[in-house]
C-alpha cells in the first residue's frame, strides 16, 4: 500500500474512533492525461518532470498534495494528483481539462485531459451477484454470506494498545474501532497466529526493513446492516490518524468483501483442527526432544559408571606406579617452570628491546632536533653575518664619504691658509716699508741744540707712540702664546705646569718663531722712553729703543709641522682685522679713549676665543687663573719739561683720567683678561702665532 502522507486540512474528516485518534477522510484524486506529439527528430525526448512542472504552474491559486506518474508511453503520460479537499477537485479540473501545454524545443502543443479518479470499490450489486451465483455458498450460514469485510494496508502502530508498549495490532482495538457500524460477531488478524504461515503456506503480512508496518484483518458483523453501513462508510475514504500534538497523517486502505469464507464455521474449525494438529506435532516434537534428552542422560550416566570403573582400575594401577608418576610430575613441574621462566625472560627481553628501540628513537629525534636547532642557528648566524657585513659596508661607505668630505675641507683650509700666508707676506712687506720709512725719518733728522732736541724727542715720541702700542700688543700676545703648549698636543716633558706670573723675571724663552727674546729689550726701551733723564736728549734715547723693539720679520719659524698650521677661520679673520685696524687707530688716537676702545676689542676677541674652545675641562684651565700677566700696554707717554705748557697740562689731565679708570677696573678686568688671553693662546695653533708675529 501507499505510504502515509501529511494532512494539513482536516475539515472534511469523519470520526471513526476518536478515542484512538482514527478518522475517515475522503479520497480527492484525479487523473490527468497529456497527449504527446510524434517525435520527428531522432534522439529528442520529452521530459516528464518538465510536463509535471507545467501542470503545477497551470494551477496558480492552489497546489497538489501529491502528483505522481501512474503510466508513461510514447503516446501519452498519465498522472495521478491528489488535493487537500473534495471541493478543490472541480476547480482543479476546470483549470486543467481541455487546456494545452507548449514545451520548449517542440513546435506542437500538448493537449491535457483531466477527470475525477474512479475508485476501485465493490458495489452492492457485486457482492449480491457473487453470493447468489456461487454454488458452494450458503447464505444462511455466517461467513458464507455478505457479512465479512476484508481490510488490507492497516498500520500496525495505529491499532496497538498504548499501555502495552508493543507495536503489534490488537483484536480488542480492532473491535472497538469497527463496532461503530454494528455488532461484531468475530474478528481475525492472521499475523497474530504463529501457525498461520505453516497452515496456509503464504505470508499474511507486509514486510519491510522497519518490521511489520501493515497488516490485514477480517471483521464479521452479526447483521447484514452492519456490513452495509461499514461498506458505505468506507467507500471512497482513506484512514487518517490524528495524534495528541494535532498533526494528522492519512494512508490509503483496501476494503473488499470476503469471498473466501474465511470466518465461516467450517473454516474456523478447519483452522482450529490444523492448529491442533500443529500443536500436537509440536508436542510430539517436544516429546521426542524430551525422550532424546532422557536417552542422552541415560547414556551419559552409563558412561559415567563405566568411567568410574575404569577410574578404579586406573587407581589401582596408579598406586602401583605412584612413585614414577610423582617423579614424572616433578619433572613436568620443573619443565613447566622452566618454560614459564623462559617465557618471562623472553617477554622481558622483548620489552627491553622495545625500550631500547624507543630510547634509540627518542635519541634519534633529539639528535634531529639538535641538528635542526644547529642548522637554524647557523642559518641565523649567517644571516646575521650578512647583515653585519652589509652594515659594515654601509658604515665603511659612510666613513669614506666623511673622509672625502674631511679631505675636501682640509684642502679648502689649506687653500685658505695659503691665502692667509700670502696676505701675511703682503702685510710683512707693508710693515717693512713702514719700518724703513720710520727709520729714514728718524735718521734724516740731525740734532742742532738741546732745546730743539727736546722738542724733536717729544714730537718723535708722540709720533711713534701708536706704533709702539701696536708692537707691544703683538709682543705681549706672542709671549703669552709661547708660555702655553701647542694646540691639541701635550706639553713638553721639561716644560713647567704653570706659566710664570712675570715673564720679565724669567730668562729669555724660546718661542715658536724665535722672537720672544726681544721682549726684555723692548720693555727697557719703553721704560727709558717714559722716564727721560736730564742729561740725555730724546733723540739719543728713543730712536735706538724704537728700532730695537721692532721685530725682525725675516725670521722664519723652524721645526713646526705643516699640519699644525690649520686654525679656525673666525680667529684668523679677527687677527686680520686687528692687524688692519690697530695701526690706523693707533696713529690717530693716543688718548685714553683710544686705549679703552682697544681694551674692549681685546675683551671681545677673548670672549669669541673662549666660546670656540673645544670643550676643554674646567680643571685644566683652573691653574692658569692664578698667574696673571702684567698689562704691557703703555699707560703713560714720555713728556719733556721743555714742552709747551698747554700740551703738558693736556697730557697730564688725560693720563690722570686714564689712571683713575684703570685703577677702578684693573682688579676684575686684569684677571679675566689674562685668563681669556691664556685660553685663546691655548686654542691657537703654532701657525697662528707665526702669522701674528709675521704681521
Curated annotation (Swiss-Prot):
Residues 425-454 are annotated as: PKA-RI-alpha subunit binding domain. There is a cross-link at residue 118 (Glycyl lysine isopeptide (Lys-Gly) (interchain with G-Cter in SUMO1)). The lineage of its organism: Eukaryota, Metazoa, Chordata, Craniata, Vertebrata. PANTHER family: A-KINASE ANCHOR PROTEIN 17A, B-LYMPHOCYTE ANTIGEN-RELATED. Residues 147-256 form the RRM domain. This is A-kinase anchor protein 17A. Residues 598-609, 618-628, 645-658, 666-695 have a biased composition (Basic residues). Widely expressed. Found in heart, brain, lung, liver, skeletal muscle, kidney and pancreas. Expressed in activated B-cells and placenta. Expressed in all cell lines tested including Jurkat-TAg, U-937 and HEK293 cells. RI-alpha binding site, predicted to form an amphipathic helix, could participate in protein-protein interactions with a complementary surface on the R-subunit dimer. Monomer. Component of the spliceosome. Interacts with ZRANB2 and SFRS1/ASF through its Arg/Ser-rich domain. Interacts with RI and RII subunits of PKA. It is found in: Nucleus speckle. It holds the Pfam family RBD_AKAP-17A. The gene is AKAP17A.
Amino acid at each position: 500500500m501507499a505510504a502515509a502522507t501529511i494532512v494539513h486540512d482536516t475539515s472534511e474528516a469523519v470520526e471513526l474512533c476518536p478515542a484512538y485518534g482514527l478518522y475517515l477522510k475522503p479520497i480527492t484524486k484525479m487523473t490527468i492525461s497529456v497527449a504527446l506529439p510524434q517525435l520527428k527528430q531522432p534522439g529528442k525526448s520529452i521530459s516528464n518532470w518538465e510536463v509535471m512542472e507545467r501542470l503545477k504552474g497551470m494551477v496558480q491559486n492552489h497546489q497538489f498534495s501529491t502528483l505522481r506518474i501512474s503510466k508513461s508511453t510514447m503516446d501519452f503520460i498519465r498522472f495521478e494528483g491528489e488535493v487537500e479537499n473534495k471541493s478543490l477537485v472541480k476547480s482543479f479540473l476546470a483549470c486543467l481539462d481541455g487546456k494545452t501545454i507548449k514545451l520548449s524545443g517542440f513546435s506542437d502543443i500538448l493537449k491535457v485531459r483531466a477527470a475525477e479518479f474512479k475508485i476501485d470499490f465493490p458495489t452492492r450489486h457485486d457482492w449480491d451477484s457473487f453470493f447468489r451465483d456461487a454454488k458452494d455458498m450458503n447464505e444462511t450460514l455466517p461467513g458464507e454470506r455478505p457479512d465479512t469485510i476484508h481490510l488490507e494496508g492497516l498500520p500496525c502502530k495505529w491499532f496497538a494498545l498504548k499501555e502495552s508498549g508493543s507495536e503489534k495490532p490488537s483484536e480488542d482495538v480492532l473491535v472497538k474501532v469497527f463496532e461503530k457500524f454494528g455488532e461484531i460477531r468475530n474478528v481475525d488478524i492472521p499475523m497474530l497466529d504463529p501457525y498461520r504461515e505453516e497452515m496456509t503456506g503464504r505470508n499474511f503480512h507486509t514486510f519491510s526493513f522497519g518490521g511489520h508496518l501493515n497488516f490485514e484483518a477480517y471483521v464479521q458483523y452479526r447483521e447484514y446492516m452492519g456490513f452495509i453501513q461499514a461498506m458505505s462508510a468506507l467507500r471512497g475514504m482513506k484512514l487518517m490518524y490524528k495524534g495528541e500534538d494535532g498533526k494528522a497523517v492519512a494512508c490509503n486502505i483496501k476494503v473488499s468483501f470476503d469471498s473466501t469464507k474465511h470466518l465461516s464455521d467450517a473454516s474456523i474449525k478447519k483452522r482450529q483442527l490444523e492448529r491442533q494438529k500443529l500443536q500436537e506435532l509440536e508436542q510430539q516434537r517436544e516429546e521426542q526432544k524430551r525422550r532424546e534428552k532422557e536417552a542422552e542422560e541415560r547414556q551419559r550416566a552409563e558412561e559415567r559408571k563405566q568411567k568410574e570403573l575404569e577410574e578404579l582400575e586406573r587407581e589401582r594401577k596408579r598406586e602401583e606406579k605412584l612413585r614414577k608418576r610423582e617423579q614424572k610430575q616433578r619433572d613436568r613441574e620443573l619443565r613447566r617452570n622452566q618454560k614459564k621462566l623462559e617465557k618471562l625472560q623472553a617477554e622481558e627481553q622483548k620489552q627491553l628491546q622495545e625500550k631500547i628501540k624507543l630510547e634509540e628513537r627518542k635519541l634519534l629525534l633529539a639528535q634531529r632536533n639538535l641538528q635542526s636547532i644547529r642548522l637554524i642557528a647557523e642559518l641565523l648566524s649567517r644571516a646575521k653575518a650578512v647583515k653585519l657585513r652589509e652594515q659594515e659596508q654601509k658604515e665603511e661607505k659612510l666613513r669614506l664619504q666623511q673622509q672625502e668630505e674631511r679631505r675636501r675641507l682640509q684642502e679648502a683650509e689649506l687653500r685658505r691658509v695659503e691665502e692667509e700666508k700670502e696676505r701675511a707676506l703682503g702685510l710683512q712687506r707693508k710693515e717693512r716699508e713702514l719700518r724703513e720709512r720710520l727709520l729714514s725719518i728718524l735718521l734724516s733728522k740731525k740734532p742742532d741744540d738741546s732745546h730743539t732736541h727736546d722738542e724733536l724727542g717729544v714730537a718723535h715720541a708722540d709720533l711713534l707712540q701708536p706704533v709702539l702700542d701696536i708692537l707691544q700688543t703683538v709682543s705681549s700676545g706672542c709671549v703669552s702664546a709661547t708660555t702655553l703648549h701647542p694646540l691639541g698636543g701635550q706639553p713638553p716633558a721639561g716644560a713647567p705646569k704653570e706659566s710664570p706670573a712675570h715673564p720679565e723675571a724669567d730668562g729669555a724663552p724660546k718661542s715658536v718663531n724665535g722672537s720672544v727674546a726681544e721682549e726684555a729689550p723692548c720693555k727697557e726701551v719703553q721704560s727709558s722712553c717714559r722716564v727721560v733723564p736730564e742729561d740725555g736728549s730724546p733723540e739719543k734715547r728713543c730712536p735706538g729703543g724704537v728700532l730695537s723693539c721692532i721685530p725682525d720679520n725675516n725670521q722664519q719659524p723652524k721645526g713646526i709641522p705643516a699640519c699644525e698650521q690649520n686654525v679656525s677661520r673666525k680667529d684668523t679673520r679677527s687677527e686680520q682685522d686687528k692687524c688692519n685696524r690697530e695701526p690706523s687707530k693707533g696713529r690717530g688716537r693716543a688718548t685714553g679713549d683710544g686705549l679703552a676702545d682697544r681694551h674692549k676689542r681685546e675683551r671681545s676677541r677673548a670672549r669669541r676665543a673662549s666660546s670656540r674652545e673645544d670643550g676643554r675641562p674646567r680643571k685644566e684651565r683652573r691653574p692658569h687663573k692664578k698667574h696673571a700677566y702684567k698689562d704691557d700696554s703703555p699707560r703713560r707717554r714720555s713728556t719733556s719739561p721743555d714742552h709747551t705748557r698747554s700740551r703738558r697740562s693736556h697730557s697730564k689731565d688725560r693720563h690722570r683720567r686714564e689712571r683713575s679708570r684703570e685703577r677702578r677696573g684693573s682688579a676684575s678686568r686684569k684677571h679675566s683678561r689674562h685668563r681669556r688671553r691664556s685660553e685663546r693662546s691655548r686654542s691657537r695653533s703654532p701657525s697662528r702665532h707665526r702669522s701674528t708675529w709675521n704681521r
